[in-house]
């Protein structure tokens, strides 16, 4: 079981080297993938940004969004974790804290490409930094 943040998912969807290295792990049928519902908005926004700046065609961005929607990813509401998200406010954005809180509750590692999130203190999550 692993928790993914949007940075990892975008790396996979864009088929970047770090995403390609993760593919075997993320597409393993024995591996359960989890994320807060927030991931949907963050991935859609990232794809929108890449399309808007010309790094992706509108068609490619849409294909990536469709591929994301088909991922076997169990999404969790973040409202049960609001108190913990608030407790983490000194070191993490509310967005990052949603992923961390979920990883804490599930006792699962959180995969991220976000160096700031990976180095943030004050939580009990196991965070794996995926570097490009």
PLM feature spans:
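Short, well-structured N-terminal submotif of metal-dependent ribonuclease cores
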Residues: 1-38, 50-59, 122
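Phosphate- and divalent-cation-binding pockets in alpha/beta enzyme and binding domains
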Residues: 21, 42, 84, 119-120
């Amino acid at each position: 079981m692993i928790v993914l943040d949007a940075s990892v998912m975008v790396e996979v969807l864009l088929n970047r080297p770090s995403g390609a290295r993760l593919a075997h792990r993320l597409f393993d049928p024995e591996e359960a993938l989890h994320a807060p519902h927030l991931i949907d908005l963050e991935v859609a926004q990232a794809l929108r940004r890449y399309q808007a700046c010309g790094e992706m065609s509108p068609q490619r961005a849409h294909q990536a969004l469709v591929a994301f929607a088909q991922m076997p990813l169990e999404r969790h509401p973040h409202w049960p974790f609001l108190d913990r998200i608030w407790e983490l406010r000194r070191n993490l954005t509310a967005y990052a804290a949603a992923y961390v809180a979920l990883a804490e509750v599930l006792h699962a590692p959180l995969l991220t490409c976000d160096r700031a999130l990976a180095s943030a203190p004050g939580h009990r999550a196991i965070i794996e930094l995926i570097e490009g």
